Amino acid sequence: NEYNGWTNWETWVVNLWMDNDQELYDHYGKMARVKVSKDKRSASYKLSLAIQEQVDDWMPHLDNSLYLDLLNGAMREVNWIEIARHILDRIEDEDSYIKEAN
């Protein structure tokens, strides 16, 4: 079910929203820099949990319904680690670009 180079459509669309919203883009970039440690795997895991918790907090509170079941099903499909790694790679690229420019 790969989609546009991502694990699946759900992961792609969550990342698309994060990348296309400047406030979210900056927020998760700052969060990633805080989470980065010597072990990138640990940073990916910690960042993925933080992102998932925030997105879960933003979900609308719905009564039990077909829509809630569909929303929960889609959220379970998101590969949060993949999104976290993408953000970490992005900030690494940005930092390298800044170093080279100076």
Functional labels for PLM-detected ranges:
Residues 1-102:
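Acidic interaction surfaces
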